[in-house]
Swiss-Prot record:
Transmembrane regions: none
A GO CC annotation given for this chain: small ribosomal subunit
Species assigned in the record: Acetivibrio thermocellus (strain ATCC 27405 / DSM 1237 / JCM 9322 / NBRC 103400 / NCIMB 10682 / NRRL B-4536 / VPI 7372) (Clostridium thermocellum)
NCBIfam families in the record: uS13_bact
Pfam family, one: Ribosomal_S13
UniProt keyword annotation of RNA-binding present: yes
Identification of the protein by name: Small ribosomal subunit protein uS13
Described purpose of this protein according to its UniProt entry: Located at the top of the head of the 30S subunit, it contacts several helices of the 16S rRNA. In the 70S ribosome it contacts the 23S rRNA (bridge B1a) and protein L5 of the 50S subunit (bridge B1b), connecting the 2 subunits; these bridges are implicated in subunit movement. Contacts the tRNAs in the A and P-sites.
Length: 123
């Protein structure tokens, strides 16, 4: 089984798809990496030679931020936004949508389950 950037690639899938199991690599980046290494995208992961796997590993490690490094960078970017107190940072801190979506209705993913407000009646 090919292990690249700490991720086991699925053996039965094509390399083009298998690489997308690595956080930070999608279809476009996967094709770009395969073009640089000269590996046929239709090759199955199980059919890759050790030389090809080492080529892939080398290119990914040198040129791209993936997995833990990328996650850390994203977390630090969000933390920085929250520290400087900009609009986006305040939205992150409040757990509300950051990119201008409406919040009067919807936004349940960011806001969590509904909190119903009870009405008190006079006795």
């Amino acid at each position: 089984m090919a292990r690249i950037a700490g991720v086991d690639l699925p053996r039965e899938k094509r390399v083009e798809i298998g690489l997308t199991y690595i956080f930070g690599i999608g279809r476009t980046l996967s094709n770009e990496i395969l073009r640089k290494t000269g590996i046929n995208p239709d090759t199955r992961v199980k059919d890759l030679t050790d030389e090809e796997i080492s080529k892939l590993r080398e290119v990914i490690d040198k040129e791209y931020k993936v997995e833990g490094d990328l996650r850390r960078e994203i977390a630090l970017n969000i933390k920085r936004l929250m520290e400087i107190g900009c609009y986006r940072g305040r939205r992150h801190r409040a757990g509300l949508p950051v990119r201008g979506q409406r919040t009067k209705t919807n936004a349940r993913t960011r806001k969590g389950p509904k909190k119903t407000v009870g009405v008190q009646r006079k006795k």
